[in-house]
From Swiss-Prot:
Residues 241-302, 367-565 are annotated as: Disordered. Its main location: secreted. Residues 731-753 form a propeptide. Induction: Expression in regulated by NRG1 and TUP1. This is Probable GPI-anchored adhesin-like protein PGA18. The GPI-anchor is attached to the protein in the endoplasmic reticulum and serves to target the protein to the cell surface. There, the glucosamine-inositol phospholipid moiety is cleaved off and the GPI-modified mannoprotein is covalently attached via its lipidless GPI glycan remnant to the 1,6-beta-glucan of the outer cell wall layer. Sequence repeats lie at residues 253-260, 265-272, 289-296, 373-380, 381-389, 390-397, 398-405, 406-413, 414-421, 422-430, 431-438, 439-446, 447-454, 455-462, 463-471, 472-479, 489-496, 497-504, 505-512, 513-521, 522-529, 539-546, 547-554, 555-563. It comes from Candida albicans (strain SC5314 / ATCC MYA-2876).
C-alpha cells in the first residue's frame, strides 16, 4: 500500500511539472517599413549602451544605417521617407537561428533603456501630404528551414536550421532626364548599359588530416577579366584637352648585362648597311630597336602581397581621379579627362566607382614585395613577331627586326671583309653561337672565322638543306640545316656556324652566305626547343643567357600578339586564408587573366554569411553609392571604426564589390542607390554578451529635385509600423525534458525498496 501511494504521488508530480512547463513561442525575423510624407525633416532616434540619441535630417535623399550586434536598421529618404528594420541573429555552431528583437530574455538579453523600442523614428512635417499609394520595390528574400532533434543525456533538443539567401545585385530601368543640370560635358543618358566583366567561380571541397584533426578545405578557382568595355555616351559639348595625349607607344625591354645600340628598322626588300668589324669581347652594333613587351618571369614570392590599381582612360572632358593603393595607404591624382574613376579599399573590400562618357578600363595588378629569378631548366621567353631579338650574356648583343640579326657572346670574332659576299634578303634571319662563335652582319660582306673553324663540320657533323624548315642542333655532333626561306646557324660549346677544329670550307675572299627571309631558328644545348613563326627572328645563347636557359627552356613566338608577363602572389589573410594567385597579362589586348586561385579555409571558420557563434557577433559594414540627376555621387564607406564620405561628378555609376570570392557589379543610371552589406565575424568576451554593441552608423545627405525609386536590399515590405510582421520562423532551441522517462525512473527506484 505504501509503494502504491508513492507511485501515485510520483505520477501526480510528473503531471504537474508537465503542466507548468510551457514551450516558448518561436522567434521571428521581421521587417517594418515606414513612409514619411513629402520633403521635410525626419528625426531618427538611435539607442545603444544604455542611452538614446536623436538626430534630424533634411529629407531629399538621406541614407542612414545602424548596426546593433547583429541588428541592422536602414533608413532611406527619397522624399517620401522609407524606414526599414531588419533583425537577424545567426550562429555557426549546431544550428543557424534567426531571432527578432522581441526575443525572450533567456535567449537573447541585453539592457534596454526606458523609452526605447516604442518607435525608431519620429517624423515632423511642415505640411500635410498624402502617403504614397504604391509600395517600394524590393529584392526577394528566400529562406529554407529544416527541423530535427538531438539527445543529450535525458534531454531532447529540437533544432531548426534556417538558411537565408539574399539577392546581392539589383538592376533598374533607365530613368530619362528631361533636363540636364548644368553639365555641358554630359548629354542625355542613353539606354545602352556598359558591359561588365564576366566572373566565373568554381569550388571543390575536401578534407585533410593532421594528427587527430580533420580539416575541411575549399578550393575555389576565380577567373576574371580586368578590362571593361562600354558604348560611348554622346557628349553635346567637348572641351579640348591638349594636356592628355593618346599614348600608343610602349617601353622596350633591354637586354640585361649588355649594351644595345639601335637604329630604325629597314623595310622588307631593301638591304641594310652596317659596319661588319667588331672588337672581340665587345658589344656588337645592330639595326633595330629591341622587342617591346618582353616577358618577365618571377619565382616564388614572399607571403606579403601588394595590390595596386592602374586606370586607363579615354580623354575628352571633365576630370579623372586615379587612386593607387599600396599596402596601407592610398594616393590620388587628378587628370583632365572625361572619365572619373574612384577606387576605395576598406577592410579588405575593394569598391570601384566608374563614371564615364566615353570609356574606362581598369587593371588590378597584384605583385609581391620580393621576387626571385627563375632557375635554369624552367625559364621561358616569348618574343614578338615582326621584330627580331637577340639576348647574349656578357658584353655583346644585337637585334635586327625586319632584317637580319647577329649575336656574338664572349670572345666572338669580327667578320673579315674582302672579296667575300653576303646576300641577305630582308625578312628575319639570325645567327647565335655561344663561346667563341661568330655572326654575320646583313647588308655587308662578312666571313665567319672563329679560331680555325668555319662552315664545315669534321667528324660526325653534317650539313642539310631543307626548304621551309628550321634547324635544330645538339651538342657533340653539331648539325647545320640551311632552310630556303629561313637561315640559321647554331652550335653549342665553342662552335660557330661550324664545329671548331681544323677543317674550314669558307675562307675570306671566296666565301658567300645566302640568307632568304622567312623564319630563323636558334637552338640551345640539352633538351631545349625553339618554336618560331615566319616574320620574326630570335636568337638565344646557352650558358648565362638571360633570355633562355639550357635544359628544358623554350622560346615561343606568336604572330600578331605582343608578349605577356606572369607573376605569382602568395598571401595569408587575417582569418587564416592562404591564397596563391598567378596572373598573366597580355600587352596587346590589355587584358589581365587570373589563373585558378586556391583558397584553403580552415574548418574553424564558417562560410555562410552572416554567421556568428555563441561567443561571436556579426559586424556589418556598408559601401553605398548614390547618383543624383547626372551631377554628383556621394560615396560613404563605413567600417567598425567610423565612416568616410567623398563626392565626385557623375552621370553613370558602376560599383564592383568583391566579398568572399563573389563579385557583385552595380550599375546606376541617374538617381538610384544600391547598398552592399559586408559581413565579418568578431569574437566577443563573455562579459560583453549582454551588452548592446554599437558598430557603425552611416549617414549620407543630399537633395534631389525628382522622385526616385527606392531600393532597399535584403528587406521585405510592410506599411504597418508595428514590429509584429513575421516572414518566417526560426528555431527557439527549445529544451523539452522527457518527463515520462523521469517519472518512470523514479517509480522504478521506489519499487526497489
Amino acid at each position: 500500500m505504501k509503494l502504491e501511494s508513492i507511485a501515485v504521488f510520483a505520477g501526480i508530480v510528473s503531471t504537474a511539472l508537465a503542466g507548468v512547463y510551457h514551450k516558448p513561442p518561436p522567434a521571428t525575423t521581421y521587417w517594418t517599413t515606414i513612409y514619411a510624407p513629402s520633403t521635410s525633416v525626419v528625426t531618427v532616434t538611435s539607442c545603444s549602451k544604455g542611452g538614446c540619441g536623436t538626430q534630424s535630417y533634411a529629407t531629399g535623399v538621406t541614407k542612414t544605417k545602424t548596426v546593433h550586434e547583429g541588428v541592422t536598421t536602414e533608413y532611406t529618404t527619397y522624399c517620401p521617407l522609407t524606414t526599414s528594420h531588419e533583425v537577424v541573429k545567426s550562429t555557426c555552431s549546431d544550428t543557424l537561428v534567426v531571432w527578432s528583437t522581441r526575443s525572450f530574455s533567456w535567449v537573447w538579453s541585453f539592457s534596454k533603456p526606458d523609452g526605447c523600442g516604442q518607435s525608431t523614428s519620429t517624423i515632423k512635417t511642415t505640411a500635410q501630404t498624402d502617403v504614397p499609394t504604391t509600395a517600394t520595390a524590393t529584392p526577394s528574400v528566400s529562406t529554407t528551414c529544416t527541423t530535427g532533434t538531438k539527445t543529450k543525456w535525458w534531454w531532447v533538443i529540437k533544432t531548426t536550421d534556417c538558411s537565408v539567401y539574399t539577392v546581392s545585385s539589383t538592376s533598374s530601368s533607365l530613368i530619362s532626364t528631361s533636363q540636364v543640370t548644368s553639365s555641358s560635358s554630359i548629354a542625355s543618358t542613353t539606354a545602352t548599359a556598359p558591359a561588365t566583366p564576366s566572373v566565373s567561380t568554381t569550388c571543390t571541397t575536401g578534407t585533410k588530416t593532421k594528427w587527430w584533426w580533420v580539416i575541411k578545405t575549399t578550393d575555389c578557382s576565380v577567373y576574371t577579366v580586368s578590362s571593361t568595355l562600354s558604348s560611348l555616351i554622346s557628349t553635346s559639348k567637348a572641351t579640348s584637352s591638349s594636356s592628355v595625349a593618346s599614348s600608343t607607344g610602349s617601353t622596350p625591354a633591354t637586354t640585361p648585362g649588355s649594351s644595345i645600340e639601335s637604329t630604325p628598322a629597314t623595310t622588307p626588300g631593301s638591304s641594310t648597311e652596317s659596319t661588319p668589324a667588331t672588337a672581340t669581347g665587345s658589344s656588337t652594333k645592330s639595326t633595330p630597336a629591341t622587342t617591346p613587351g618582353s616577358s618577365v618571369t618571377t619565382g616564388k614570392t614572399s607571403t606579403d602581397w601588394i595590390t595596386s590599381f592602374t586606370t586607363h582612360t579615354a580623354h575628352t572632358t571633365t576630370v579623372i581621379t586615379v587612386t593607387d593603393c599600396d599596402h596601407h595607404s592610398c594616393t590620388s591624382n587628378v587628370v583632365t579627362t572625361g572619365v572619373t574613376v574612384v577606387t576605395v579599399t576598406t577592410t579588405g573590400t575593394v569598391t570601384e566607382y566608374t563614371t564615364y562618357c566615353p570609356l574606362t578600363s581598369t587593371e588590378t595588378i597584384v605583385t609581391s614585395k620580393t621576387t626571385s629569378a627563375t632557375t635554369p631548366g624552367s625559364s621561358s621567353v616569348e618574343s614578338t613577331p615582326g621584330s627580331s631579338s637577340a639576348t647574349t650574356p656578357g658584353s655583346s648583343s644585337a637585334t635586327t627586326p625586319g632584317s637580319s640579326s647577329a649575336t656574338t657572346p664572349g670572345s666572338s670574332s669580327a667578320t673579315t671583309p674582302g672579296l667575300s659576299s653576303v646576300e641577305s634578303t630582308p625578312g628575319s634571319s639570325s645567327a647565335t653561337t655561344p663561346g667563341s662563335s661568330s655572326a654575320t652582319t646583313p647588308g655587308s660582306s662578312s666571313a665567319t672565322t672563329p679560331g680555325s673553324s668555319s662552315a664545315t663540320t669534321p667528324g660526325t657533323s653534317s650539313v642539310e638543306s631543307t626548304p621551309g624548315s628550321s634547324s635544330a642542333t645538339t651538342p657533340g655532333s653539331s648539325t647545320i640545316e640551311s632552310t630556303s626561306g629561313s637561315s640559321s646557324a647554331t652550335t653549342p660549346g665553342s662552335s660557330s656556324a661550324t664545329t671548331p677544329g681544323s677543317s674550314s670550307a669558307t675562307t675570306p675572299g671566296t666565301s658567300s652566305v645566302e640568307s632568304t627571309p622567312g623564319s630563323s631558328s636558334a637552338t640551345t644545348p640539352g633538351s631545349s626547343t625553339i618554336e618560331s613563326t615566319s616574320g620574326s627572328s630570335s636568337a638565344t645563347t646557352p650558358g648565362s643567357s638571360s633570355a633562355t636557359t639550357p635544359g628544358t627552356s623554350s622560346v615561343e613566338s606568336t604572330p600578331g600578339t605582343s608578349t605577356g608577363s606572369c607573376w605569382v602572389s602568395v598571401s595569408t589573410g587575417g582569418y587564416g586564408y592562404e591564397t596563391t594567385v598567378t596572373i598573366c597579362s597580355d600587352v596587346t589586348s590589355g587584358q589581365s587573366v587570373t589563373t585558378p586561385t586556391t583558397i584553403s579555409v580552415p574548418s574553424t571558420f564558417c562560410t555562410t554569411v552572416p554567421t556568428a557563434g555563441t561567443d561571436e557577433t556579426v559586424i556589418t559594414s556598408y559601401v553605398t553609392s548614390t547618383a543624383h540627376s547626372t551631377e554628383v555621387i556621394t560615396v560613404t564607406s563605413c567600417a567598425d571604426n567610423g565612416c568616410q564620405t567623398h563626392t565626385t561628378h557623375t552621370g553613370v555609376v558602376v560599383v564592383t564589390v568583391t566579398t568572399t570570392d563573389v563579385a557583385t557589379t552595380y550599375t546606376t543610371y541617374c538617381p538610384l542607390t544600391t547598398t552592399k552589406a559586408v559581413y565579418r565575424v568578431a569574437k566577443l568576451a563573455n562579459y560583453k554578451r549582454d551588452q548592446t554593441e554599437f558598430i557603425a552608423t552611416e549617414t549620407n545627405e543630399n537633395t534631389s529635385n525628382w522622385p526616385a525609386p527606392t531600393l532597399v536590399p535584403y528587406v521585405g515590405i510592410s506599411n504597418d509600423s508595428s514590429a509584429a510582421v513575421s516572414t518566417f520562423e526560426g528555431a527557439a532551441n527549445s529544451v523539452v525534458p522527457r518527463l515520462g522517462l523521469i517519472a518512470g525512473f523514479l517509480s522504478a527506484l521506489l519499487f526497489l525498496f
